[in-house]
Amino acid sequence: MERSVTAGKWLAYCRLMRIDKPIGSLLLLWPTLWALWLAGGGAPAPWTLFVFVAGVFLMRAAGCVINDYADRHFDGHVKRTASRPLPSGEVSEQSAKVLFVVLVLLAFGLVLTLNTMTIWLSVAGLGLAWVYPFMKRVSHLPQFVLGAAFGWSIPMAYAAVSESLPATCWMMFLAYICWTVAYDTQYAMVDRDDDLKIGVKSTAILFGRFDNLIIGLLQFSMLALLLILGTMTGLGMPYYISLLVAGGMFIYQQILTAGRERDACFKAFHNNKYAGMAIFIGVLFGL
């Protein structure tokens, strides 16, 4: 019995860190890889690659923990999140705080093996990750903060590889923010009715009936910025083909979300992991 209880507790911690749902890690991983390859004009050093890949999974897990801690009094009132470990009581608030600190320390320990610029940037990134979960209390624009928090791996990657933050770095960062706001608005559309009842704010609520139009504009802006980025860095035809592929996926997502049904919006959100992968393949073969 004791062994089964222990196993159940570990499973609850895994669910709290979303180990069973890697979509968030993938949406963070792909642009990190774009930046690592573009910053150095090719494959980064193996250790640098390891630090960033491990850091993606550690910080995404930490972000999920602090997000659920911040939302612990709201999640129980939302159908999709009521069974999460904190609102269901499977994991205590104190345990969640300890887990968050452990994950952050592990990630920071890896960053300490990189250069000074990257270390300082990581401190700013932690601040963004901490602020994001609480933004939905005070603003309808938490998705923009999420984009900055998730996208902060881009300047960190440039700093780690080239010890510089050129214009191309910030162009990619801005493109990623546009993409994040687009896909996280799709995600927020799933919970929009529940969020309205409990007073949680989001871009899905702010955009209202113009949600799909604004998502489309954000997706177009992302592709336009990445197109300019490609010309600035001299990327080859495979990269531009990958942008067309991603654009096709965005059109598919628009078709999915046209009826604003929960399952369709969630499916559209998940489709973004393939768009990110397609662009990385384009970067890989376009260099």
UniProtKB/Swiss-Prot annotation:
Names of required cofactors: Mg(2+)
GO cellular component, one term: plasma membrane
UniProt pathway annotation: Cofactor biosynthesis; ubiquinone biosynthesis
GO molecular function: 4-hydroxybenzoate polyprenyltransferase activity
Main location: membrane
Catalytic activity: all-trans-octaprenyl diphosphate + 4-hydroxybenzoate = 4-hydroxy-3-(all-trans-octaprenyl)benzoate + diphosphate
Example of a GO biological process term: ubiquinone biosynthetic process
Subcellular location: Cell inner membrane
Enzyme class: transferase
Entry superkingdom: Bacteria
Keywords for this protein: Cell inner membrane, Cell membrane, Magnesium, Membrane, Transferase, Transmembrane, Transmembrane helix, Ubiquinone biosynthesis
Membrane topology listed for this record: Multi-pass membrane protein
Membrane-spanning intervals of the chain: 23-40, 99-119, 141-161, 163-183, 213-233, 235-255, 266-286
InterPro entries: HB_polyprenyltransferase-like, Prenyltransferase, UbiA_prenyltransferase, UbiA_prenylTrfase_CS, UbiA_sf
Enzyme Commission identifier(s): 2.5.1.39
Function: Catalyzes the prenylation of para-hydroxybenzoate (PHB) with an all-trans polyprenyl group. Mediates the second step in the final reaction sequence of ubiquinone-8 (UQ-8) biosynthesis, which is the condensation of the polyisoprenoid side chain with PHB, generating the first membrane-bound Q intermediate 3-octaprenyl-4-hydroxybenzoate.
NCBIfam families: ubiA_proteo
Family according to the record: Belongs to the UbiA prenyltransferase family.
Entry protein name: 4-hydroxybenzoate octaprenyltransferase
Lineage, top ranks: Bacteria, Pseudomonadati, Pseudomonadota, Gammaproteobacteria, Enterobacterales
Protein's gene: ubiA
